[in-house]
Amino acid sequence: MGCAPAAHYLPGGGWRRLLVVVVALVVLDRAGARVRAADDDTGGLSRAAFPKGFVFGTATSAFQVEGMAASGGRGPSIWDPFVHTPGNIAGNGNADVTTDEYHRYKEDVDLLKSLNFDAYRFSISWSRIFPDGEGKVNTEGVAYYNNLIDYVIKQGLIPYVNLNHYDLPLALQKKYEGWLSPKIVGVFSDYAEFCFKTYGDRVKNWFTFNEPRIVAALGHDTGTDPPNRCTKCAAGGNSATEPYIVAHNIILSHATAVDRYRNKFQASQKGKIGIVLDFNWYEPLTNSTEDQAAAQRARDFHVGWFLDPLINGQYPKNMRDIVKERLPTFTPEQAKLVKGSADYFGINQYTANYMADQPAPQQAATSYSSDWHVSFIFQRNGVPIGQQANSNWLYIVPTGMYGAVNYIKEKYNNPTIIISENGMDQSGNLTREEFLHDTERIEFYKNYLTELKKAIDDGANVVAYFAWSLLDNFEWLSGYTSKFGIVYVDFTTLKRYPKDSANWFKNMLQASGPGSKSGSGTSDSQVGSATSASHPVGSAISSSHRLLLPLLVSLHFLFPSFFMFLSL
């Protein structure tokens, strides 16, 4: 007789109520499926798509996430008074508390592990170790980083430690004029040596500096960042000379610190050391000889400023020809020290620009930025180079990843590269739900990683990739109006909520294959906690609806009154 008569055995019109339940479950399941679809579509990417042993991680920096800015024995950095000056930071934000990782580092490391990442790249606050930049050691600060490093390792993750991420101790700026003085070379090297001696038994991956070009250019050419020096700045400065002096002293500081590491620690500690450089890809606006030359000048003045001396022992020819006597020179001894002073290079890659030739105007003030003799162009024939993210400088151009990595491979004899930062930001004015469902960020990572894979397949020696950033945090001049994290932070409660992009990484990285490491997966409870934070209803329905439907039918037979409320 078939199954239709079964309806007659459901008491009190229960069939209609059961139908309501079934429809509700289907609707919820489809909603969850739509959410999961974005998370689960890895675009063909997996661990197996990358070389065996390839490392995936996320990155942060001390000033941006730690908090405890005036506590725990930490001395001020050059950024501390700057962020407390009204009008300097969007929304007048500051980093006094930020994400409070100082107290919540275990929670963040656990979260990182639950998302199937392999490594955590973070920086040490120089003034938390040496409040005055030199001299007396702050034992509380030393203990904090010991605890952080130990916990990262305990959780099966790899620490990648950066010694300086913009936050020069304020005392050194006042005493020596910061990076303008050659005296700081020895001071930084002493700090670095202390860190090698204290943490190097566990830390096997070091970086000396993060984006020294930013320190030189924004701190001493435009003057927008601390110490806010430029030709027309109230603090004084010379945009034609100081950026080059600062970069020169940072390069010597890096090389001297590396020399100490190699001579005193590397053999016994068996670690490696490098430097992090930013590199926007520069594409000529047209095929003209002039625009192609402009694009090459931009590459030389941007990343070549550091890669050329660190690999070849001298500055790029374009810089020597244009800057002339304003460009410092290395002595033979310094050139020998600098050349080859990196085991790998961290590359922060975000965006790309078109470059057009622009002869220097006769009356233009001489500066580092004017020395490029280029125009930055963001569209060609009315078509933008890419979709703009929240930041006005960040155009989403995935092919720029391939261009940057392949360029370094071809020009610099294929050095070992770590993609040390890559990401995009959202506006800080969204709702929590809008933050969590960050499909644009998923597409960003999918497309940029696809281009990175192409570069690796074409022979680029890239060994690791770090997303910027684990957490929404204090984004320098943008304060809290710019959100780069794959994890949303409620800055009222400081509670963390993994975004869809975090779950996308979790799904992509849990795939087994030649690139995976043993034990890299997560337990069911870890996966569940990470997923449900973003979309609890969808994830719960997706995993249990096949069990719920038969259960509900049985309940209708046994306890018809249980569902009576559904008919109201």
Swiss-Prot record:
Keyword terms, alphabetized: Disulfide bond, Glycoprotein, Glycosidase, Hydrolase, Signal
Annotated InterPro entries: Glyco_hydro_1, Glycoside_hydrolase_SF
Gene3D superfamilies: Glycosidases
Enzyme Commission number(s) from the entry: 3.2.1.21
Positions of disulphide bridges: 230-233
Binding site for a beta-D-glucoside: 64, 165, 210-211, 350, 421, 468, 475-476, 484
Catalytic residues (UniProt): 211, 421
GO annotation, biological process: carbohydrate metabolic process
Superkingdom of this protein's organism: Eukaryota
Catalysed reactions listed for this entry: Hydrolysis of terminal, non-reducing beta-D-glucosyl residues with release of beta-D-glucose
One Gene Ontology molecular-function label: beta-gentiobiose beta-glucosidase activity
Signal peptide region: 1-33
Glycosylation sites: 287, 429
Assigned protein family: Belongs to the glycosyl hydrolase 1 family.
PANTHER family hit by this protein: BETA-GLUCOSIDASE 8, GLYCOSYL HYDROLASE
Function: Hydrolyzes p-nitrophenyl beta-D-glucoside, p-nitrophenyl beta-D-mannoside, p-nitrophenyl beta-D-galactoside, p-nitrophenyl beta-D-xyloside, p-nitrophenyl beta-D-fucoside, p-nitrophenyl beta-L-arabinoside, cello-oligosaccharides, laminari-oligosaccharides, sophorose and gentiobiose.
This protein's name: Beta-glucosidase 8
